[in-house]
Swiss-Prot record:
Top-rank taxon, per record: Bacteria
GO CC annotation terms, alphabetical: cytoplasm
Annotated localization: Cytoplasm
Family: Belongs to the SepF family.
Protein name, as recorded: Cell division protein SepF
Role according to the record: Cell division protein that is part of the divisome complex and is recruited early to the Z-ring. Probably stimulates Z-ring formation, perhaps through the cross-linking of FtsZ protofilaments. Its function overlaps with FtsA.
Provenance organism: Bacillus velezensis (strain DSM 23117 / BGSC 10A6 / LMG 26770 / FZB42)
Chief place of localization: cytoplasm
A Pfam family matched in the record: SepF
Location of the region described as Disordered in the Swiss-Prot/TrEMBL record: 21-56
GO terms for biological process, alphabetical: division septum assembly; FtsZ-dependent cytokinesis
Subunit structure: Homodimer. Interacts with FtsZ.
Compositionally biased tracts (Basic and acidic residues): 26-40
InterPro entries the record matches: Cell_div_SepF, Cell_div_SepF/SepF-rel, SepF-like_sf
Length: 152
Protein backbone atom coordinates (compact mmCIF):
# COMPACT_ATOMS: atom_id res chain seq x y z
CA UNK A 1 0.00 0.00 0.00
CA UNK A 2 1.37 3.35 -0.95
CA UNK A 3 1.87 6.20 1.47
CA UNK A 4 -0.85 8.17 -0.28
CA UNK A 5 -3.42 5.43 0.30
CA UNK A 6 -2.40 5.07 3.94
CA UNK A 7 -2.98 8.76 4.58
CA UNK A 8 -6.27 8.66 2.71
CA UNK A 9 -7.49 5.73 4.79
CA UNK A 10 -6.29 7.31 8.00
CA UNK A 11 -8.08 10.65 7.50
CA UNK A 12 -11.26 9.42 5.87
CA UNK A 13 -13.57 6.55 6.60
CA UNK A 14 -14.19 4.02 3.92
CA UNK A 15 -17.70 3.03 2.96
CA UNK A 16 -17.23 -0.36 4.59
CA UNK A 17 -16.83 1.25 7.99
CA UNK A 18 -20.14 3.07 7.60
CA UNK A 19 -21.97 -0.22 7.19
CA UNK A 20 -20.95 -1.41 10.64
CA UNK A 21 -21.65 1.81 12.44
CA UNK A 22 -24.74 1.62 14.62
CA UNK A 23 -26.60 4.68 15.91
CA UNK A 24 -28.32 4.28 19.25
CA UNK A 25 -31.73 5.85 19.64
CA UNK A 26 -33.84 6.72 22.64
CA UNK A 27 -35.89 3.58 22.09
CA UNK A 28 -32.86 1.33 22.60
CA UNK A 29 -32.10 2.62 26.15
CA UNK A 30 -34.98 4.71 27.53
CA UNK A 31 -33.76 4.49 31.15
CA UNK A 32 -30.45 6.18 30.27
CA UNK A 33 -32.31 9.02 28.57
CA UNK A 34 -34.42 9.60 31.69
CA UNK A 35 -31.29 9.79 33.83
CA UNK A 36 -29.84 12.40 31.51
CA UNK A 37 -33.00 14.49 31.84
CA UNK A 38 -32.58 14.51 35.62
CA UNK A 39 -29.00 15.75 35.40
CA UNK A 40 -29.03 19.45 34.58
CA UNK A 41 -26.12 21.87 34.67
CA UNK A 42 -25.79 23.86 37.90
CA UNK A 43 -26.80 27.10 36.22
CA UNK A 44 -30.03 25.56 34.91
CA UNK A 45 -31.18 24.15 38.24
CA UNK A 46 -33.69 26.06 40.28
CA UNK A 47 -32.50 27.28 43.68
CA UNK A 48 -33.59 25.01 46.45
CA UNK A 49 -34.62 26.01 49.92
CA UNK A 50 -34.81 29.52 51.29
CA UNK A 51 -34.02 32.39 48.93
CA UNK A 52 -32.05 35.34 50.27
CA UNK A 53 -34.10 38.44 49.62
CA UNK A 54 -33.08 41.74 51.18
CA UNK A 55 -35.66 44.45 51.60
CA UNK A 56 -34.69 47.73 49.98
CA UNK A 57 -35.95 49.62 53.02
CA UNK A 58 -33.52 47.83 55.34
CA UNK A 59 -30.62 48.86 53.12
CA UNK A 60 -31.65 52.49 53.28
CA UNK A 61 -31.94 52.43 57.08
CA UNK A 62 -28.33 51.32 57.49
CA UNK A 63 -26.95 54.48 55.86
CA UNK A 64 -25.40 56.75 58.48
CA UNK A 65 -23.56 60.04 58.60
CA UNK A 66 -20.82 60.36 61.21
CA UNK A 67 -19.82 63.73 62.65
CA UNK A 68 -16.17 64.01 63.62
CA UNK A 69 -14.11 66.75 65.22
CA UNK A 70 -10.55 65.43 65.44
CA UNK A 71 -8.14 67.06 67.90
CA UNK A 72 -5.02 65.17 66.82
CA UNK A 73 -3.79 63.63 63.56
CA UNK A 74 -4.11 60.09 64.97
CA UNK A 75 -7.92 60.37 64.85
CA UNK A 76 -7.78 60.44 61.03
CA UNK A 77 -7.55 56.65 60.94
CA UNK A 78 -10.84 56.36 62.84
CA UNK A 79 -12.48 58.60 60.23
CA UNK A 80 -11.00 56.42 57.47
CA UNK A 81 -12.45 53.32 59.15
CA UNK A 82 -15.92 54.89 59.01
CA UNK A 83 -15.42 55.54 55.29
CA UNK A 84 -14.28 51.95 54.72
CA UNK A 85 -17.50 50.82 56.44
CA UNK A 86 -19.43 52.84 53.82
CA UNK A 87 -20.50 55.68 56.12
CA UNK A 88 -20.37 59.36 55.16
CA UNK A 89 -18.33 61.55 57.52
CA UNK A 90 -18.56 65.29 58.20
CA UNK A 91 -15.17 66.44 59.49
CA UNK A 92 -14.89 69.69 61.46
CA UNK A 93 -11.27 70.86 61.58
CA UNK A 94 -11.82 74.15 63.41
CA UNK A 95 -10.28 72.98 66.69
CA UNK A 96 -6.99 71.68 65.35
CA UNK A 97 -3.81 73.39 64.22
CA UNK A 98 -3.59 74.27 60.53
CA UNK A 99 -0.65 71.96 59.72
CA UNK A 100 -2.38 69.02 61.44
CA UNK A 101 -5.65 69.81 59.65
CA UNK A 102 -3.87 69.85 56.31
CA UNK A 103 -2.33 66.43 57.01
CA UNK A 104 -5.75 65.05 57.94
CA UNK A 105 -7.29 66.38 54.71
CA UNK A 106 -4.43 64.82 52.72
CA UNK A 107 -4.91 61.49 54.48
CA UNK A 108 -8.68 61.52 53.95
CA UNK A 109 -8.23 62.52 50.30
CA UNK A 110 -6.15 59.39 49.79
CA UNK A 111 -8.69 57.30 51.63
CA UNK A 112 -11.69 58.46 49.59
CA UNK A 113 -9.68 58.04 46.38
CA UNK A 114 -8.84 54.45 47.32
CA UNK A 115 -12.48 53.55 48.02
CA UNK A 116 -13.84 55.47 45.02
CA UNK A 117 -15.52 58.11 47.18
CA UNK A 118 -15.44 61.89 47.25
CA UNK A 119 -14.36 64.70 49.55
CA UNK A 120 -15.94 68.17 49.42
CA UNK A 121 -15.42 71.34 51.36
CA UNK A 122 -18.77 72.42 52.77
CA UNK A 123 -17.66 75.25 55.02
CA UNK A 124 -14.76 76.97 56.64
CA UNK A 125 -12.59 74.08 57.88
CA UNK A 126 -15.48 71.61 57.41
CA UNK A 127 -15.31 68.74 54.93
CA UNK A 128 -17.74 66.06 53.78
CA UNK A 129 -16.17 62.69 52.99
CA UNK A 130 -18.39 60.16 51.26
CA UNK A 131 -17.86 56.57 50.11
CA UNK A 132 -18.91 55.41 46.65
CA UNK A 133 -22.44 54.43 47.76
CA UNK A 134 -23.36 58.04 48.71
CA UNK A 135 -24.24 60.64 46.09
CA UNK A 136 -24.04 64.32 47.00
CA UNK A 137 -25.97 66.79 44.88
CA UNK A 138 -25.85 70.55 44.94
CA UNK A 139 -23.17 72.97 46.04
CA UNK A 140 -22.65 75.37 48.90
CA UNK A 141 -21.36 78.74 47.88
CA UNK A 142 -19.80 81.06 50.38
CA UNK A 143 -17.90 84.29 50.36
CA UNK A 144 -14.36 83.43 51.31
CA UNK A 145 -11.91 86.03 52.51
CA UNK A 146 -8.54 86.06 50.81
CA UNK A 147 -6.94 84.89 54.06
CA UNK A 148 -9.23 81.87 54.31
CA UNK A 149 -8.74 81.02 50.65
CA UNK A 150 -4.96 81.03 50.99
CA UNK A 151 -5.12 78.81 54.04
CA UNK A 152 -6.12 75.76 51.97
Amino acid sequence: MSMKNKLKNFFSMDEEEYEYEYIETEQDHPEEHEQQKDKQPAYAQKPQGKQNVVSLQSVQKSSKVVLSEPRVYAEAQEIADHLKNRRAVVVNLQRIQHDQAKRIVDFLSGTVYAIGGDIQRIGSDIFLCTPDNVDVSGTISELINEDEHQRW
